[in-house]
Amino acid sequence: MPEPGNRFGRKERRERHSGRVDLADTEDWIRAYVEPVGPIRAEHERPWATVLRVPIAGGVTWFKACGRVQGFEPRLTAQLFARHPDFVAEVLAHHEQRAWLLLADAGTPIGILGNPPETWLALLPGYAELQREEAAQVGDHLAHGVPDLRVATLPSRYDELLQRELPLEPEEIDRLRAFAPRFAELCDELDAYDVPETVQHDDLHMSNVYAQGEQLRVLDWGDSSISHPFASLVVTFRFLEEVTELQPDDPWFERLRDAYLEPWGRGLEGVFALAMRVGIFAHAIAWLRQRDHLPPKDRAEFDSVFSIVLRRAIAQTTSPPR
């Protein structure tokens, strides 16, 4: 959809950095596309984004203002919706410079439905098809700010991770340091396979998949990167274990893996296992990028969860892949 011109100057830069918005200015922009029938209210406010609920006749729309760390999300979402309108939330408007996004309502998050594996079985083949088609757009996505976490970049990113102050015990950091040469070998091994790197959602869980009748849509692309596609299921499988309480050896994991891999071709089970192992570390590296954009006052709360992500990676320094 066409965007208004970029007329906003210093205030725009401040808002985009923080994800906060001036409500009056925001309402003017929203009203150019929809007619609210009640108060526009904040649904949530985070350092990286603010989401507003916009009531309209017959339903609701959603406004999102992204901070700088996720500033690529509105354009990426609009591009994905243009090419995959049945799989991504309908984009009513976006403003690339202000990092603003206006979405139609997409239904109910599947977490409210219990995060059933049957829903993932229906979703994952379509998600794989989206990734396959988006591989042709990698250059464009990178040029417009989607983070580059391609496999060849990961060893150097791993080294950068080790140079940072991490919310871990010294012996845990030592384990990560000792694993660095092996991690580089795993990346080389994974990079040798002929699987195209593409958009990887990296937050593909029950709160970001919505159901509206039989229609399933993926939302919240702000954690995406260009990376190995198979690593998308790192987060999906984690939530199926932790929330749905599937055991690691539950047959559902193989069923979901096979459903996801079917569009990619045969004989990729070993590549998938390797990508999942490497992907756990890539996910931790991506979290570091988010952390770097937080104000100091918000880092302690963030680190309480970041430490869990890091420890899941540490477990892979000795554990074989699934």
Q: Residue locations for each model-derived region?
A:
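Juxta-kinase regulatory segment immediately upstream of eukaryotic protein kinase catalytic domains
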Residues: N6-I40
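ATP/Mg2+ or Mg2+-diphosphate-binding catalytic cores
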Residues: R7, S18, Q247-P248, G265-G267, ...
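Active-site acidic catalytic loop and adjacent metal/ATP-binding pocket
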Residues: R41-A57, W62-F63, V91, A184-L233
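A glycine-centered beta->alpha junction motif in the catalytic cores
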Residues: L102-P116, R132-A136, D159-P167, R277-R299
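A cross-family kinase active-site recognition segment
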Residues: G114-R175, V195-E197, S225-I226, A300-S304
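All-alpha amphipathic helical-bundle segments outside canonical DNA-binding/catalytic cores
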Residues: H144-L149, G265-V278
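Active-site activation/catalytic loop segments of kinase-like enzymes and analogous catalytic loops
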Residues: L216, P229-G265, R277-P296
